[in-house]
């Protein structure tokens, strides 16, 4: 394998055995691709904005004399870039401009004569844009739109599994779900009649909808039933025989023909009888007259002479009717074929309960059901029914819906109309009846072929369409209002409804969520999340077990492990590593094609529906060198079941062992040895890890770390290869390789790094360069590490030396004992940044003022403020300190106009202001690292604001000037090359000032042209620089667009350094979580024979019952990795020659099966080997991919090479007594995370505070400054102790006895410690509740 210069710095030893057939795809593509589809111009008009516009336009006036047509749209440039939007608190969006054409037709002239056409570009609101990392900046905060898993449109056949009716009878139903429009349900009731519901309203007999579609009773019976034809000959009744229909019945008479008796009366008719009848070609048999009684007529029979109806269709025949028919001369009688087994009389029975008899009455019935209480007219009823399922404006199945609909009904074509046809409805009813008759299966709702993904783009498009439809109504009104000659398209369109709809979606939809930004993994997982909740989805309360459960079709599409614990379990899922959505929005996963028993590298993506038809081998099936299966029988999946298949039957094979799990779960090493419940916790807790001060790569990883770090976007990645020309803390400059340059550009890439910014979770985002001057860079190399990344690999925690042993009860019940060394070395120290804002408003009594002149505040409190009343940067502040001084006018009295005038003239003001300064919250302390002042346009800026502005201008100018100098240097280097190549001597050229170089002329015309081009570029560069500087200046100096009534906003950023302390929560990656119980002095920690103490002591009892053995294997492998690092470190210290070093490192990389990774250190230069050794001396990082990890023998081999006992256990000594422990202890390196549940944020105490309104009890929770609840069980405890007085004060004065507590306060102030308990308020609440039930209850004085 070829490594780039940057990759050679540290190579992770890979224990994977299976070849990597497919690279991990870009992890954010589900978000980016979907949004790209939304805003991209689509000439077909299938997707995105284009589709929305085409579906609503053209809009015609009611009279048809004019229409507004859509031509095209374009998105403008955003005003501010992403970072500016975050600082200013605005939305990162672009203006949408649409070209519309207003066409006015002549009134009197023939159809379509155009009188006037006006075209104009109209502004239609702002569309929020996605940042390159798949997020949206809405009002300054980063948000993510989570994809939704919802029921696919189409038709679904289902049953209630016998739960509805008490008899336990299974009732079947069918439901046609459109993408938008009314739902249509068909269902059987316990009496086997078929009913229909529209939009889940009350049910009507299903035949009503057929009547409304203009079918007569005869036609309905004809559609759903086969006929049995009776003939009357010579006063005998004969029946046309279809032998197959008799199977399974008991003969009620002798079946005979041509004098031969085939079946005797009372015998059951079997397949043998039927074969005989067919063989003898029997078509007519004589039946007794009684046999026809109870049969149902299939059509109307009318007496032709009189015209009266003898027998209507769907009437039961009787002997009287038979006689009448015979008299009227009917020789053939058509009846319906039904039996109890597989041809039930359902539709015939339904017709009997149907109150309607023609189209109009059916339409009226439907109208009454949809609009109860409104008087139906024929026209209204027809319109309503027409609009329900047959109007493209009101109903749309969508392409997906039509495809699913046609597939479900076994049709060949998959495209078709978005509205329903008569045929569609009839075929659905036929299929439902077939299922009731026992032919066909019901659908599985939880099958991923019946649930599809709705991503950002699609949801945004739907919202946009909603806005457009609102506009459409207004436009129709305006087009009809008359004087169109004066109007332009702009006057028709009001952009407000559109921007309101879009804004509402991005700002407050259930699926638009505040991004989880704890660390890079939590960002990526949040963007790859799939929720079944949200508009049009499920609700937590209604979702049962089945929906939440893991389904066989989840394999390779949705992770079976990563889902939240609690009420949302199984409703919120995570996309698997390789999964993607297809054009219809169904999830698909890649497989390798198997042809003639040979596994090829050809990759096919299969959706859940397609997968059902194939036999798919697992990724860990053994293959020989040619790609054939080694074993005869291979474990495969087919139709949702796993079993053994012969190798010739296999169609596909999994791509990778980790294709089952999500990104979060794929980062857990030895996942295959963990119980699933604990793995779930492990995957979820990695997302809560707080970035530490110095990131430390995991010694034991899975090989996914790099992909996550790079794709998350927290690192800075090289867009093009080149050479590092300049690097400092805030920018990296790359001189681009010649072959990657665009013709005629300077060939310089500048990367500006983010420093100390606040994340959504108040953690710190800061980038640090990880390349040095002069290093060669390739495209895709990591240039700078972000939070929680180390040399381009995800690094959520720290490698800690752990021992599994009890230690004096300090690790009872999952507590964790930590060494003081961990605190000294700042291993788990993290920086948290808080933003506090002070808003100065314009009140009725006058403006609030930000000032250092605050009434009744001492000098000491103002010592950290400048003259404008704003805290200095660098000030260390603690709870209660003033950050921004602010006074608010106090209104004792509303002043009369005369007084106002006098006040204005003599300006006495100080008397009536109150202090409303921004103070540091009680539990917070830290350092002020930044202050931002935003001033409304037209309000005078204070001194501090001007200082900040000047500083920003200086910084911007410096940045741009440096950028210009760098680009100029690059350009002049190229000009120099051209001139020298054109024959100018280099020495002379050096003496000439650079500005004069461009005046030189060259004889070679091509070179001269090149020179002129470069000169042009130089001028362009300078002009561009001036333009950029001017734009920057304008942005910085202009006033800010603040909310109405706000004059100024001051934002203060505090940085807090949090060391680890008892009460903080820590965890490993295997769901092994605990709370720190004690920080122990180093000298008291257990130590080994070399005197090395351990960092953390964990309880061994936490392992067996939880079955997460992965942590033990990780510990052993970590120990081995560290052992090898120690050996390399010793060799470096002894300054051994490079050859020995190279040989030892090569041995480490060659150890094990190594089928996937080959590292050849002979291709490395000595410097590269030394740099690799420097990076490996803290431990050799290893990767054990999920389900394909290191084997026991490999771990033992590595332990041996590192000079560690292969048992992984060593003798430890007690740090306090120096005695050795009698048994050997498992010691090794485990990757530990500090989770974002810090004791600092949870510590809380209350003195006097606020009370709840009704119960008068103290509120609960830290945010409300609440008290501790003394609950039911605590009361029992005091009762058990017999502590009556303590209990009394708990239940009265300390809680909700209002008079008692005020009295007590007075007493304490007066110095007497008396208490008089009274009536608790909650008792009064109880009395009132009892009275509200109508029971009078009174307290009587004794």
From Swiss-Prot:
PROSITE patterns: RNA_POL_BETA (PS01166). Keywords: DNA-directed RNA polymerase, Nucleotidyltransferase, Transcription, Transferase. It catalyses: RNA(n) + a ribonucleoside 5'-triphosphate = RNA(n+1) + diphosphate. InterPro entries: DNA-dir_RNA_pol_bsu_ext_1_sf (IPR042107), DNA-dir_RNA_pol_bsu_external_1 (IPR019462), DNA-dir_RNA_pol_su2 (IPR015712), DNA-dir_RNAP_su2_dom (IPR007120), DNA-dir_RNAP_su2_hyb_sf (IPR037033), RNA_pol_bsu_bac (IPR010243), RNA_pol_bsu_CS (IPR007121), RNA_pol_bsu_protrusion (IPR007644). It is an enzyme of class 2 (transferase). Coiled coil: none annotated. It holds the Pfam family RNA_pol_Rpb2_2. Belongs to the RNA polymerase beta chain family. DNA-dependent RNA polymerase catalyzes the transcription of DNA into RNA using the four ribonucleoside triphosphates as substrates. This is DNA-directed RNA polymerase subunit beta. It comes from Edwardsiella ictaluri (strain 93-146).
